Amino acid sequence: DQKLTLEIARVIRLGFLQQNAFHKEDTYVPMEKQLRMMEIILHLYDRCKALIDRNMPMALLRESDIFEKIISIKYDVANDKLEQLNLYDDKIEEFYQHLMAENA
């Protein structure tokens, strides 16, 4: 559980708080995008917590690239294409379902 907290803190630090003023998408991020990014990070936490509660090791969760995908949201989704953020919720669900099926 503590390892998950540290991993989510890393996602928040790198994917949400750290800013690159020289990057086109990161110079200014609309409030709506910021809110959706935090909702997606919370969704990731909730799904990972559910997996850990089923005794899946954090190392197994880290084998996936889901954490890196979430970190890269602000660069991968243009500020004028916020509907693409919904795809990340789908990716988290796929990640969750895959691990549940593989390790049930």
Task: Describe the predicted segments one by one.
Residues 1-104:
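Conserved catalytic/coupling modules of large nucleotide/cofactor-utilizing molecular machines
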